[in-house]
């Protein structure tokens, strides 16, 4: 005779539920264990990972030219539109500032996922500033810096850095709208003026300057200019490489005579280079006139410094060389990229 255990209905239900819960708990534990054992992917920069995952197509430069209405310059996959401010007559300490001395608006197009990233530097008068920055915002672009390049300049001009991202046609259309707003506020096309388009006198001993600075410059309309890249720093903005052609460089523009010269320029520096570069320039009689950023999402952090010096040309060059020696110390200064036309 078999003995049968008869359970009450409530006990039977509880027993069944306990079994179901045990199976569920075991399944959850196994799933969590598998998740914990799965190799983790290091994601220090989501933007950079996004760039790696998405394909990047070459720029449609013909579309940019057609939309913006002017030809640019192509360099290593990037395309730059430059607008010399020939309508502005500016002097600093008796020296005429022409486009080659740092008086040009430019917008650079770089290949990016789904189109292009643009970065630009707009030369604006005080009357231009408000309407142009309104146009930038209305177009959905960003303003990343507003600053001076000179002091004691007449008339006063400001420099506004902008950025944007989208399809090539879209960002080209936005760029054209901003450039058109500048034409509207000025009442003319800055590139077609003749106020600052002429050459200036320059009797500098450029070979002596080259020897002191250890670079070779380029002469443009009486301005002898050096542009020095920073290949020792792998700079990115939103995961996109920022090149010398895109404005990531140190430059120096000389004019005048051997005994009475002027030099204007821009230093690009990492955060640890800022203090020693400023100290060295000032100790060598070169005036620091601005310290600022150009970008806001760059990695690593980069600062830009504008300077102005008047005096004996070779003494100015020695001071600049001493300041250059404060940068790129982790890597040799030899071999840094340079082209006098990288920064227009």
Regions found by a protein language model. Give the residues of each.
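Bacterial N-terminal signal peptides that target proteins for export
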Residues: 2-15
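C-terminal multi-pass transmembrane helix bundles with aromatic-rich, positive-inside signatures
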Residues: 6, 23-25
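N-terminal compositionally biased, intrinsically disordered segments and leader/signal-like regions
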Residues: 7, 19, 42-44
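Bacterial N-terminal signal peptides
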Residues: 14-23
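Boundary at the C-terminal end of the N-terminal hydrophobic targeting segment
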Residues: 26-30
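Long, contiguous binding/interaction regions
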Residues: 31-156, 163-302, 308-344
């Amino acid at each position: 005779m078999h003995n049968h255990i008869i359970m009450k209905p409530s006990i039977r239900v509880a027993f069944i539920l306990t079994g179901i819960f045990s199976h569920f708990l075991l399944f959850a534990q196994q799933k969590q264990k598998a998740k914990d054992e799965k190799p983790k992917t290091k994601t220090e920069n989501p933007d950079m990972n996004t760039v790696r995952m998405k394909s990047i197509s070459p720029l449609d430069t013909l579309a940019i030219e057609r939309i913006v209405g002017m030809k640019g310059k192509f360099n290593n996959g990037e395309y730059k539109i430059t607008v010399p401010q020939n309508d502005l007559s500016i002097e600093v300490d008796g020296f005429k500032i022409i486009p080659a001395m740092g008086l040009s608006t430019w917008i650079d197009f770089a290949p990016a996922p789904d189109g292009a990233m643009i970065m630009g530097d707009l030369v604006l008068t005080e009357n231009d500033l408000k309407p142009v920055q309104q146009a930038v915002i209305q177009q959905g672009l960003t303003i990343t810096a507003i600053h001076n390049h000179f002091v004691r300049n007449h008339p006063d001009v400001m420099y506004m850095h902008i950025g944007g991202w989208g399809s090539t046609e879209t960002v080209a259309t936005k760029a054209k709208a901003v450039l058109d707003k500048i034409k509207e506020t000025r009442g003319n096309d800055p590139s077609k003026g003749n106020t600052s388009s002429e050459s200036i006198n320059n009797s500098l001993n450029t070979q002596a300057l080259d020897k002191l600075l250890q670079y070779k410059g380029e002469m443009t309309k009486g301005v002898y200019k050096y542009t020095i890249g920073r290949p020792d720093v792998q700079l990115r903005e939103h995961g996109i490489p920022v090149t010398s052609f895109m404005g990531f460089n140190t430059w120096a523009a000389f004019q005048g005579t051997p005994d009475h010269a002027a030099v204007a320029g821009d230093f690009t520096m990492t955060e640890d280079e800022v203090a020693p570069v400023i100290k060295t320039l000032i100790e060598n009689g070169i005036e620091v006139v601005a310290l600022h950023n150009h970008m806001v999402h760059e990695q690593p952090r980069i600062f830009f410094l504008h300077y102005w010096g008047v005096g004996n040309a070779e003494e100015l060059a020695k001071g600049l060389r001493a300041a250059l020696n404060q940068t790129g110390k982790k890597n040799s200064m030899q071999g840094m990229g340079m082209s006098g036309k990288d920064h227009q």
